[in-house]
């Protein structure tokens, strides 16, 4: 991570780079990051996923602090992908399919600003595609407003290790779920 360009590193843009120069990064917030991460893990062309916190104002947050509602961070999945195999538009389709983008600061029983809907982009092309996809999604909802925010990706703070690939590792009850590419098994989210 480069040095801070503001007085608060949490407000800086995410300057991390993919491990391979031909790959890209993307950040998505769609409620609890466990189920979202597993869905992205299954996408052909996704090289790596990490869950963490972004878009907040507190440097080096942790899960307990984010859940307190005082940091303004979102729970996000950061995806490293090969755009030659998996176009960004495919990731947007996965994002929209994983949650209700019309509920503000909640997904199901999970309530709080950390569960808001957001697309956090790394370049102008991602910004443009995200906005077009939101416009298309809004047409599907006649009487509801899509509340998904689309903003530049701020610094990514990797969540605690036990959150990484949580459902693939068995979650809270030891029932491992497949992260195999192309898997369409239902995703069961449990703590």
Swiss-Prot record:
It is an enzyme of class 1 (oxidoreductase). Residues 1-20, 168-191 are annotated as: Disordered. InterPro entries: Met_Sox_Rdtase_MsrA_dom (IPR002569), Met_Sox_Rdtase_MsrA_sf (IPR036509), MsrA_MetSO_reductase (IPR050162). The keyword Kinase does not apply. One of its GO terms (cellular component) is cytoplasm. GO terms for biological process: cellular response to oxidative stress. Transmembrane segments: none annotated. Its EC number is 1.8.4.11. Keywords: Oxidoreductase. It holds the Pfam family PMSR. One of its GO terms (molecular function) is L-methionine-(S)-S-oxide reductase activity. Belongs to the MsrA Met sulfoxide reductase family. Has an important function as a repair enzyme for proteins that have been inactivated by oxidation. Catalyzes the reversible oxidation-reduction of methionine sulfoxide in proteins to methionine. PANTHER family: MITOCHONDRIAL PEPTIDE METHIONINE SULFOXIDE REDUCTASE, PEPTIDE-METHIONINE (S)-S-OXIDE REDUCTASE. This is Peptide methionine sulfoxide reductase. It comes from Fragaria ananassa.
């Amino acid at each position: 991570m480069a040095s801070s360009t503001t007085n608060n590193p949490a407000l800086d843009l995410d300057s991390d780079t993919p491990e391979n120069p031909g790959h890209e990064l993307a950040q998505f917030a769609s409620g609890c990051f466990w189920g979202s991460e597993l869905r992205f893990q299954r996408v052909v062309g996704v090289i790596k996923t990490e869950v963490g916190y972004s878009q907040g104002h507190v440097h080096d947050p942790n899960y307990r602090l984010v859940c307190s509602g005082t940091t303004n961070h979102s729970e996000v999945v950061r995806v490293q992908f090969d755009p030659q195999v998996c176009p960004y538009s495919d990731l947007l389709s996965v994002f929209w399919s994983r949650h209700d983008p019309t509920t503000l600061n909640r997904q199901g029983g999970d309530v709080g600003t950390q569960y808001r809907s957001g697309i956090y982009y790394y370049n102008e092309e991602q910004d443009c595609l995200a906005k077009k996809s939101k416009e298309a999604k809004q047409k599907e909802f006649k009487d509801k407003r899509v509340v998904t925010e689309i903003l530049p990706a701020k610094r990514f703070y990797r969540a605690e290790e036990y959150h990484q690939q949580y459902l693939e590792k068995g979650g809270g009850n030891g029932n491992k779920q497949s992260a195999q590419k192309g898997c369409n098994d239902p995703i069961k989210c449990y703590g």
